[in-house]
Amino acid sequence: MGNYKVLVTGGAGYIGSVMVPQLLSSGYSVTVFDNFMYKQNSLLDVCYHPSFSVVNGDVRDIEALKKEIINHDIIIPLAAIVGAPACDRDPSLATDVNLTQVENISKWVSASQMVLFPVTNSGYGIGQEGVYCDEKTPLRPISHYGQTKVAAEDVLLQMGNVVTFRLATVFGCSPRMRLDLLVNDFV
C-alpha cells in the first residue's frame, strides 16, 4: 500500500482495535490518537510493530490533534462518545468529541489527504414500517448522538476528499469489547 501514513483517532476503541491490526498487516503506517478512557490495553498485540505508533491524547486538545492531522495521508476519525445514553449523560462532551473534533479536522486536512468517516445509522431516526433505508433516505436523528454524528458527516461532505460509511450496529468480538450492546450478549 505504498508508504501511506494513517491516523486513527479513537484507534484503541471497539472498531479501531480491530481495524488497526488490519491496516498494519496491509502495509500501512498507523498512528493511534486515543485518550484510553477505558484504561484498555486493546492494542497490545501490535504495540511492537515497526509501523505503529501511539499518541496518548484527547481529540479536544486542538494543537496536539492538529500536529498529527497534518502529518498523515489518511485520517480515520473514530473517536466518539458512542450511543444515546452516553451522549445524554454529558451532551457538551459528546458535542466536543463527536462534532467539534470533526469540524477541526475539516479545517486542517489538505486536498492531498483523505478522510474515511464511519457514521451511525442513528442518523435515520425512527424508520417507517416496511420502508428500508438507503443513501437517499432522509436523515432525521432523534438522539443527541445521532444529531452530532449527522452534523459531523455534513461538515465532512463539504470537502472533496471524504468517504463516509453509514454503519448499522457494529457487533462482535473486539479487544475492546462493548458490553453495553445487547447484541454482543449473543456473540
Segments predicted by a language model, with ranges:
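Alpha-helical substrate-binding/gating segment
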Residues: N184-V187
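A short helix->loop->beta-strand "cap" motif at the edges of active sites that frequently abuts
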Residues: S110-M114
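Catalytic helix-loop patch of NAD(P)-dependent Rossmann-fold dehydrogenases
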Residues: R89-S92, D96-N104, G123-T164, T169-R178
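Glycine/Thr-rich phosphate-binding loops of Rossmann-like dinucleotide-binding domains
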Residues: G16, E63, P85, G125-Q128
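SDR active-site strand-loop-helix element
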Residues: T9, F33, I75-A79, V115-N121, ...
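NAD(P)H-binding glycine-rich loop region in Rossmannoid oxidoreductase-like domains
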Residues: V59-D96
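N-terminal Rossmann/SDR dinucleotide-binding element
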Residues: M1-I74
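CheY-like receiver
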Residues: K67-E68, W108, V155
